[in-house]
Curated annotation (Swiss-Prot):
Keywords associated with the record: Chloroplast, Plastid, Ribonucleoprotein, Ribosomal protein, RNA-binding, rRNA-binding, Transit peptide
Organism in which the protein naturally occurs: Spinacia oleracea (Spinach)
Gene: RPS31
Family affiliation: Belongs to the bacterial ribosomal protein bTHX family.
Region (Disordered): 27-47, 59-101
GO terms for cellular component: chloroplast; plastid; ribonucleoprotein complex; ribosome
GO terms (BP aspect): plastid translation
Name this protein carries in UniProt: Small ribosomal subunit protein bTHXc
Source domain of life: Eukaryota
Pfam families hit by this protein: RPS31
Length: 101
């Protein structure tokens, strides 16, 4: 408590203020733009990672597919889904070392 009275900062304080702006209309008809929200913060923050990630590390872009050697297969497939009925194996007829004349 004594540190608060003396004015020495004991811990970092973050202050955030919100302000809302909305004009009222006459007879239920709105004459202005939609409500706006403004946010001001006294704390400086480092820029966050972008929400849209593109480039070599993005497997959903052409450059990212080439970089990761995925050859266009960005999303894993369920091997049991959409394959149709199983096919019977095909065996070669006869012995390949014998030739028919």
């Amino acid at each position: 408590m004594a540190s608060l009275l003396l004015g020495t900062p004991s811990m970092a304080c973050h202050s955030v203020s919100f302000s809302f702006s909305h004009s009222q209309s006459v007879a239920g008809v709105s004459l202005s733009s939609p409500p706006t929200l403004s946010l001001s913060s006294s704390v400086s923050t480092s820029p966050a990672l972008p929400l849209i990630y593109c480039g070599r590390g993005d497997r959903k872009t052409a450059k990212g597919k080439r970089f990761n050697h995925s050859f266009g297969n960005a999303r894993p497939k369920n091997k049991n889904k959409g394959r149709g009925p199983p096919k019977a194996p095909i065996f070669p007829k006869g012995d390949p070392s014998q030739k028919e004349d």
